[in-house]
């Protein structure tokens, strides 16, 4: 809505760029690439922010969590041994200049209660297939970006297979990103397994070169913090000279931030 665009105007204006997004869009299309903005997160919150930011700049880098293990993404990582494609796909489509029908196709989810395709998202399957064709997940993302004329880049925070583990205030522990909010317990801390996952070099470079670094919006413990747990990401953000902005969710989230 209007408040969202006012937020974006404020962020960009603070960097010395015109506040009016139509004016900035005009300049971007006529040779000015815009400020270098890095957004860290995952889930639908990150994709929503990217849709707004791409109207200001094509120098966008989305650093995305790969700890998801539920739904279609979880099935694909278990059956094919790939990184979960869901959050990456959402960000790619948010930054795409694709036709509406093509966008709708890549967001299509197979329905039905039986069959191997039931519950799978077509875009997830496409990314998985592209990974097989190109030989690795990062190249698959780059080729997907080319197909959809993506503005900017989408980068997994790590290429290591990682899982998210939560410890609650009652000392109980659960492993699995999709399980964490379901317990109804208050989260004490979350950690990555393994804890020494190496960051993607391209992600570190994007952070170092950024004019603005944005954290969120999104699920605090299962979308934003997992990126910061990747070894080296937090240090890179702290070292960067760019202003850092945390975009808080409008509402608290059951299973994650009640009472905050």
PLM features: residue spans?
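Short gly/pro/ser/thr-enriched loop/turn and capping motifs at secondary-structure boundaries
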Residues: 67-73, 222, 244-246, 252-255
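An anion/phosphate-binding loop that grips the pyrophosphate of nucleotide cofactors and donors
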Residues: 210
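N-terminal signal-anchor transmembrane helix
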Residues: 10-38
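Electropositive, gly/pro-rich neighborhoods at or near active sites that engage anionic ligands
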Residues: 1, 5-8, 14-18, 67-185
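A short helix->loop->beta-strand "cap" motif at the edges of active sites that frequently abuts
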Residues: 58, 240-244
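Active-site glycine-rich loop that binds ribose-phosphate moieties when present
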Residues: 20-24, 189-204, 229
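Acidic, Ser/Thr-rich low-complexity segments on the non-lumenal side of membrane proteins
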Residues: 33-57
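Glycine/threonine-rich flexible loop motifs
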Residues: 220-230, 255-256
């Amino acid at each position: 809505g209007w408040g969202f665009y006012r937020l974006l105007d404020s962020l960009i204006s603070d960097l010395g760029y015109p506040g009016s997004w139509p004016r900035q869009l005009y300049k971007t299309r006529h040779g000015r690439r815009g400020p270098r903005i890095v957004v860290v997160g995952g889930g639908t919150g990150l994709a929503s922010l990217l849709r707004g930011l791409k109207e200001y700049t094509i120098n966008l880098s989305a650093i995305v969590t790969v700890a998801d293990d539920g739904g279609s993404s979880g099935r694909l990582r278990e059956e094919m041994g790939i990184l979960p494609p869901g959050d990456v796909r959402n960000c790619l489509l948010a930054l795409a200049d694709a036709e509406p029908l093509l966008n709708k196709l890549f967001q299509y989810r197979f329905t039905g209660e039986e069959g191997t395709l039931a519950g799978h998202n077509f875009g997830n399957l496409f990314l998985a297939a592209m990974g097989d064709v190109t030989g690795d997940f990062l190249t698959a993302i780059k080729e997907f970006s080319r197909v959809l004329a993506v503005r900017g880049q989408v980068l997994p925070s790590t290429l290591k297979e990682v899982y998210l583990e939560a410890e609650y205030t009652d000392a109980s522990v659960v492993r699995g990103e999709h399980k964490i909010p379901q317990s109804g317990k208050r989260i004490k801390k979350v950690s990555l397994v393994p804890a020494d996952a190496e960051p993607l070099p391209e992600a570190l470079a994007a952070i170092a070169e950024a004019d603005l670094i944005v954290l969120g919006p999104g699920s605090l413990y299962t979308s934003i913090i997992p990126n910061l747990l990747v070894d080296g990401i937090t240090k890179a953000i702290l070292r960067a000279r760019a202003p850092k902005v945390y975009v808080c969710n409008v509402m608290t989230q059951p299973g994650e931030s009640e009472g905050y």
